[in-house]
């Protein structure tokens, strides 16, 4: 189990999870606010 935790904390695994989350977030933002190059309401 300790080796599995070490594997999950390596940079490629963390980067894959992060970029997957970021891509999903951007897809959902573009679904609700299509073609928004700028977000004037922030």
UniProtKB/Swiss-Prot annotation:
Principal subcellular localisation of the protein: plastid
Q: Where in the cell is it found?
A: Plastid, Chloroplast thylakoid membrane
Per the record, what is one GO cellular component? photosystem I
- The UniProt record lists the keyword Nucleotide-binding: no
Q: Which Pfam families match?
A: PSI_PsaJ
Q: Which residues cross the membrane?
A: 7-27
What is this entry's stated membrane topology? Single-pass membrane protein
Q: Which GO terms describe its biological process?
A: photosynthesis
Q: Output the InterPro entries linked to this UniProt entry.
A: PSI_PsaJ (IPR002615), PSI_PsaJ_sf (IPR036062)
Key words, A-Z: Chloroplast, Membrane, Photosynthesis, Photosystem I, Plastid, Thylakoid, Transmembrane, Transmembrane helix
Where are the coiled-coil regions?
none
Function (record text)? May help in the organization of the PsaE and PsaF subunits.
Q: Which family does it belong to?
A: Belongs to the PsaJ family.
Protein name, UniProt field = Photosystem I reaction center subunit IX
Organism lineage = Eukaryota, Viridiplantae, Streptophyta, Coleochaetophyceae, Coleochaetales
Q: Which gene encodes it?
A: psaJ
